[in-house]
Amino acid sequence: MSHTAEIPLVPGSESPLELKPLKAADPHVVYHRRAHRLLSLAKDSPLADYFELCRRLVSIQAKLAEEADFGQLLAWGKDEATPLSLLGSEADSYWQGLLQQLLSDLLPQVDESIARVVRLLMQQSPEQLSSWGRSLRQGHVSEVPAHFSLFIWAAMGVYWSHWAPMVIKRMDQRKVAQQSMCPVCGCHPVASVIVDQPRAGLRYLHCSLCESEWHYIRAHCTSCGQDKEMTIWSLDDAQAQVRIESCDECHGYTKMMFVEMSPSMDVVADDLATLMLDSELNAKGFGATTLNPLLMAHEIT
């Protein structure tokens, strides 16, 4: 159960063909679909055990997204570029409460090695958790113990994704500029998704925290913005469902998920399932400018 601050909605066009700068997610639906996709992908993956852990975690996220008490929307920067990035320390108690619920639900579902990590995380102080949460949201992954990051981000994701749709309704989307970071919460994208609605071939970046999507013109680097020296890579053919767009100027890259070709795809799960593409690009001297909430393995600046 949750309550929304009394902030007037910003009117928008009703044209079905209008390009939407921002698209809100239904977190319960997103998490449910992600869990199903992880189950499907695990069948042919050498990382089947890890996929199963992630599936259980995401299934708990789906449950919390539907059943948890999120309190009321805290003060947020409605006139700022990334309003949910400005939530104060009051938000910490809410997402930390979700973290304890998530860990309690997960504990009986994991083996003893994971259970030890879960119990240790449950014993951390609120101040320590707040510090780690800030570091993760700022992309400073190395400042947080690697064995805790997955669970902390999962809890924060449930909280931020709950409020993002309501905040988006109250944002003036006419002021949303093309940008590398999420216009709602300020976090990194997971990857690009190529969609066929409202028009075929549109690209959106998918947020790693609040699950929102924002439009970004294709053939432009999603990190530095240049549009002249871009290269497309794929493992099999030019029409692959997952491809990588790399930038010859900043040497960053982002994956592109062609969900128009395969509607069952999930940006987080399918990014995790195509790590061989990352290995190929890393070997060529390129680095990801994105963050996967299920594999927080590198520093992002």
Swiss-Prot record:
Protein name: Protein FdhE homolog
Gene assigned in the entry: fdhE
Classification via HAMAP family: FdeH
Main localisation: cytoplasm
InterPro entries noted in UniProt: FdhE-like_sf, FdhE_C, FdhE_central, FdhE_N, Formate_DH_accessory
Keyword Cytoplasm: yes
One Gene Ontology cellular component: cytosol
Function: Necessary for formate dehydrogenase activity.
Transmembrane segments: none
GO molecular function: ferric iron binding
Record-level GO BP terms: protein maturation
Species of origin: Shewanella baltica (strain OS223)
Compartments (UniProt record): Cytoplasm
